[in-house]
């Protein structure tokens, strides 16, 4: 079984040979010679017994020594002639016929001249060019040689076959047109014969159709056989190419053996011939690298590289297991079935993958939608919980026959009657002389009256009546509840609430009189005119008890409540302070947070403000209360009295408690801020009013407590005013924009410069004495200089202090520049005071006087020195201190002269 060849359609001139092919299976019945000339290549057909070996070697030697004919890749224009033997002819059916035998003999003796522009095989003859697409690996002439396989020749098959007396003379496959054409022609005599035998036209058409189908089937069989023959031909051509390479190499080796001395090829050249092409080509190239000329060497190298690549590709592509190719007649059907199965499986996998991905996407979308639905449901439930629920009374069945059920005014005012009322704040009962018939318009007025009664109830729950001093303790302990909120925003002794209640009663009387005289329309049962039975607003945010407790503690401890409200007793009852500050909405929100834990200062809406807090702020607005002039004058007088009392008491206590030193530099600044604090305290205490006649003692205690707290606040502010914190300074951008930013100029610190000293080699002394490294010697050596440096530093530090502290740090009569201190007093143990020091006048060197108790001196510019000190300045300094000089002389007597440098 001959392995088939898988071909691919190349982009340019060239062909690709497939699977492995053993070199031992190659036969030499055909010799393929390559030439670069324009003439037709000559391929000699070997005889039955084959040519002589000498002739072969001579021919190969002649061809191989031609440098341009081996491995040439420059020329693309050449012609190739294939002389096919009998085993490569097309095996067509009906081999026993005379026509087939003649054609077979003609094919065996015919030379096919194939040029580069020759037409290719028809589409039906090409071997599945779409199955594989491999990159082109063949170089030059070999690629062109193998590329002409699929461009062989126009196949003309002529066959005559008689079927039921009808002759189909010709079945033409024309490769020039690239299409399959079937020419069915019949002789007139045959047609007349058929028409004579066939009785009807329908039978003639049926017979013609059957014959046409048979012809097409036969044509398909022929095409399949042609494909198989083409694959066999390709395999033979691959064998010829491999054999050609072997012959070229053998001829070259024999040529080198005959022409060169035998010493060069001591490494068994026959082994090189029998080995694989890779080893042979590498051995040849390494063995002949020194003997060949440059041109021949490059040609051999190119030839070896091309042959190596071609054989690698042949060995790779001719593997029947990898390619699935076979020369069996059923190979096409099996390959088609396998390809169909592979395609079906691939399509099924792709569809399954697509469906799976789509299913996953749908699942994710469904889960996302479910999450959104759940989120919207929760949000809807929260909105419904937060939304107030309105309950209206049931409308009457007959608007004009049956009266609506209305709660009695006494029932609505029962809660207000239970609360203690002022004698002037009595609420008169509604008029009883009005007509109560259903057609009367007074029912609408009664509804208005009941709504006003409810407002009266709310206001009465917020007001504090004037009680006796005996009842004041009970009222202070009692905590009222209004609208579900604890009322802790008021105390008992506020006269403006009673005045406000009296004015509201008068207004209700006026409105009632006007409404009784006005004409009303008939009563209807719409929701707009139906009485409101209940209103309940749920809070969306509910805070825990721990947060409310912490919030209350923070509110009382925060600086906001230091001026608005302060706790007066253990029950956290507080008093309104400043009316101007209470009108701010954020303060109302803070008070609402204190009164009700459900109210949040940020998250809650303004309309969720507790009603008692909102109504408690209304009486403090003087421009909203339009009362009698007498009441306002009296109230203003009481306010003036309380304000004067508070300001006087606070000012006396403040002056007695704090009296700054008049000699301090910040005296004027503190006095200015004290006047400002007094004005602020007077403004804060302006809102505090207490009834002088009823609760004078409690008012005095409260004023004393408030004044003490104000004094403490003023002290803290004055104490913090002396310290400047850069982080707490706030400058408006309007002041910064037109100004230019100035950079701080830092003064450079003058450091002593270093002097380069030429190092001289020290002569080793005759008698080396050990140096005294004890602590006492070190201290005695350096104590004097340390004291001098301390004196200099302290005087420099005093001179660099700010200007505002110079008057306090120095005395009035002396200046820091006029003080001269001597180092002798600071160094000698007999010096007790600065006055006992005597300045020394030696050598123009200015000495310093230093005292640890009163460092008020200023240094005069001293001489610049270079450290370490040399011998002369050291001796000069030692001479200025007698005691140290004596010690140094004693040391110098004990040690050599060179040891003095260490001092």
From Swiss-Prot:
InterPro entries to which the protein is assigned, alphabetical: NSL1, PEHE_dom
Domain PEHE: 748-862
Positions of the UniProt region annotated as Disordered: 319-343, 419-441, 652-676
GO cellular component: H4 histone acetyltransferase complex; intracellular membrane-bounded organelle
Entry coiled-coil feature ranges: none
Gene3D superfamilies: 6.10.250.3170
Biased composition (Polar residues): 423-441, 652-661
Protein name: KAT8 regulatory NSL complex subunit 1-like protein
